Amino acid sequence: MEPCELQNELVSAEGRNRKAVLCQRCGSRVLQPGTALFSRRQLFLPSMRKKPDLVDGSNPDGDVLEEHWLVNDMFIFENVGFTKDVGNVKFLVCADCEIGPIGWHCLDDKNSFYVALERVSHE
């Protein structure tokens, strides 16, 4: 999606999500509209798979993603689970179908939770 399209369709003038954020696989609601800030930061996320396969760390395949929703409090999420620690990172997964990672949380920064726009859908 082009930056201008992104700004108009998904990001409000205040930089917040205009639409609800949903799991791409099962449609479960991850975030309500207006609860996250748009952020550009390069983060590596492993390829999408079920939660138990994420914590073994044996599969380095994945993507460097740049566009994210930034949430500063884990209790803002509607339906998100967290993996066990993988180094100093916890990956975010859908709490209903356990597919992920849809996002990333560094344990060094207690107030930053990133959800990759490419790993979720919007409604």
UniProtKB/Swiss-Prot annotation:
User: InterPro entries per the record?
Assistant: Mss4, Mss4-like_sf, Mss4/transl-control_tumour
What CDD domains is this protein classified in? RabGEF
Q: What residues does Zn(2+) bind to? A: C23, C26, C94, C97
Q: Which UniProt key words apply to this protein?
A: Acetylation, Guanine-nucleotide releasing factor, Metal-binding, Protein transport, Transport, Zinc
Tissues where the protein occurs: Ubiquitous.
Q: Does the entry feature the keyword Cell division, yes or no? A: no
Q: Name one GO biological process term.
A: small GTPase-mediated signal transduction
- UniProt cross-references to Gene3D superfamilies, sorted A to Z: Metal Binding Protein, Guanine Nucleotide Exchange Factor, Chain A
A GO CC term attached to the entry: cytosol
Q: Name one GO molecular function term.
A: guanyl-nucleotide exchange factor activity
Q: Which domain of life is it from?
A: Eukaryota
Q: Where is the MSS4 domain?
A: 9-123
Q: Does the keyword Mitochondrion apply?
A: no
Q: Which residues carry this modification: N-acetylmethionine?
A: M1
Pfam families this protein is in? Mss4
Query: What does the function comment of this entry state?
Result: Guanine-nucleotide-releasing protein that acts on members of the SEC4/YPT1/RAB subfamily. Stimulates GDP release from both YPT1, RAB3A and RAB10, but is less active on these proteins than on the SEC4 protein. Might play a general role in vesicular transport.
- Subunit comment for this entry? Interacts with RAB8A.
Q: Which family does it belong to?
A: Belongs to the DSS4/MSS4 family.
Q: What is this protein called?
A: Guanine nucleotide exchange factor MSS4
- Source organism phylogeny: Eukaryota, Metazoa, Chordata, Craniata, Vertebrata
Q: Corresponding gene?
A: Rabif
